[in-house]
Amino acid sequence: MDRLEAMTVLLAVADAGSISAASRKLRVPLATISRKVSELETHLKARLLMRSNRRVKLTEAGLAFVAASRRILQDVGDAERAASGEYKVPKGELVLSAPIALGRLYLLPVVTDFLREYPSIDVRMMLADRRLNLVEDHIDVGLRVGKLEDSSLTAKKVGTVRRVVCAGPEYLERRGVPKTPEDLKNHDCITFENTLSSQTWTFPVGKTEKDFPVHSRLVVSTAEAAVEAAIAGIGLTRMLDYQIAVQRRAGTLKLVLESFRSPPKPVHLIFEGSRHLPLKTRTFIDFAAPRLKKAIEGITK
């Protein structure tokens, strides 16, 4: 039995929370994962996992062995990176993720500058408006908007964004400018499918929040489509401010209901751990964080 491989498999199961998720993460057949865990338990003469149909839970022995395995594998990885020179020169593939518009408009310019600066690093960018899992999707650094759900990740804040309401000048001239959220019932709106925002929009009212009904004249599935429709004069739409910053500066979209803006949402770079980071990852975070912060601060200007 390859004990380092067995430790790697057990850690994948523990981190992913199930054998099937570990199988997807490692790209190894489900039966192989189960067999290697069973072999390790036989070798140790101890039960490491409590299995159920969907999830697994570490036993007391499993918790202790996983903690020790994590330290051992980290030390082995450090030794390999030191021997290969990775701690002297950042190199290798770096996998990044971000929401589509935020990634295209703000992360991509940083990445192109980073690639010019570090020719030994290759980057793979995964842009998606659904939340990707850093562990399961093999992501080194993610750019995230909103409250962080996984407390085991390390986060570096690079700014805040807000949800705003906007429309094209032609629409506002034709239909008038809403003064309060109650006015929305008299307007056409562009909303997103499969979300509550297609029926109501939430605004702060005093110290609480209140839902206001909206009329969805057009329902779309992407932010880009909503922006184009708003510019074309179809109606009001509600977006995160970074999604319309270019159009707002160009004058093709105007903000309304600015006195009723929602609370700011934090934007973070997230990654696994802060100690023993591969040099390529630490180098990117140090390079990207101040540049992203400056770019995001410029959204409202």
Predicted regions mapped to residue ranges:
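A short LG(V/I)-centered, amphipathic sequence patch enriched
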Residues: 41-58
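Conserved amphipathic alpha-helical core elements
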Residues: 40-41, 253
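Short helix-boundary/capping micro-motifs
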Residues: 12-27
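C-terminal effector-binding regulatory domain of bacterial HTH transcription factors
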Residues: 67, 120, 242-250, 254, ...
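Central regulatory/effector-binding core of bacterial HTH transcription factors
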Residues: 92-154, 301
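Flexible hinge/capping segments at coil-to-helix
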Residues: 152-163, 167-190
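Secondary-structure junction motif
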Residues: 188-207
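Short helix-loop hinge/linker segments at domain boundaries
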Residues: 53-56, 63, 74-97
